[in-house]
Amino acid sequence: MEPAFGEVNQLGGVFVNGRPLPNAIRLRIVELAQLGIRPCDISRQLRVSHGCVSKILARYNETGSILPGAIGGSKPRVTTPTVVKHIRTYKQRDPGIFAWEIRDRLLADGVCDKYNVPSVSSISRILRNKIGNLAQQGHYDSYKQHQPAPQPALPYNHIYSYPSPISAAAAKVPTPPGVPAIPGSVAMPRTWPSSHSVTDILGIRSITDQVSDSSPYHSPKVEEWSSLGRNNFPAAAPHAVNGLEKGALEQEAKYGQAPNGLPAVSSFVSASSMAPYPTPAQVSPYMTYSAAPSGYVAGHGWQHAGGTPLSPHNCDIPASLAFKGMQAAREGSHSVTASAL
């Protein structure tokens, strides 16, 4: 009786790889061998490999059985629950014990004899699979018991804290009498700015806002720029020239020297001799570019009333220096007069 599926060997017989030979063919091989037929002739007649015939006959001569499988059955189980319990006890008493030491203790305590004592590999497998998780759980429980109580959390960034608008507002709020003052970093929690720019992250904007609020000078905001003009600035002091100290100007004119040997001509004029700046026309911020240019002036606002394009500050420059060379300019540098001073 041949199976319906399998592979074909060199003799033309069909076999299934990894499966034992059917019992009917095994019995036929033994019967032909008892009749005195050689194994090679049995192999050709039954179309079974010569190695398979020899193996079956050798097993039959030794055991008297033609059935496949291990002889005498499997080895009895040695890792009984009692053995596992003793192994767990040894491991709990001495966590650093080795597998071969556990094997020797099982023999010494009479738990096992030399026939059913588990091997070192079996003990290691028991320690890894069945007792390892329990040991780890015990260590975790002991760690939780000895763990100290958590300390109260400190406020975030309490050492290197930069001022924020909220802390500044909290500092400005007056504290009622009889109540101790609470620091700003503890009274109100920190809130991060809405944007993620570098100035907001580093707190530069909040610092500049506080400086502008605490400074005695008024800094106009963007909304007030359109209403500012020349007339809004305060007039210069009588002892100042063009907003500068008169003493400093006289000292500079006294000790100042012209570079490259050119005559030194002071460009400073008194505030009384200058014409006032033309008042700019008030332009609406919503005006389009097609508005009439009524606020424009033909000349420069800083030009002197009696000056010329060549001498805007009405300085007396001698005509003899008009087309002189460099040497002549050096010789006549002491004859130059500055009427503006």
Swiss-Prot record:
Keyword set includes Phosphoprotein: no
Annotated region (PAI subdomain), positions in chain: 7-63
Region (RED subdomain): 82-130
GO MF annotation: an example: DNA-binding transcription factor activity, RNA polymerase II-specific
Keywords: Developmental protein, DNA-binding, Nucleus, Paired box, Transcription, Transcription regulation
Subcellular location as annotated: Nucleus
This protein's name: Paired box protein Pax-9
Function: Transcription factor required for normal development of thymus, parathyroid glands, ultimobranchial bodies, teeth, skeletal elements of skull and larynx as well as distal limbs.
Alphabetized SUPFAM superfamilies for the sequence: Homeodomain-like
Any one annotated GO CC term: nucleus
DNA-binding region: 4-130
Pfam families, sorted: PAX
Region (Interaction with KDM5B), start-end ranges: 168-189
Assembly mode: Interacts with KDM5B.
Domain of life: Eukaryota
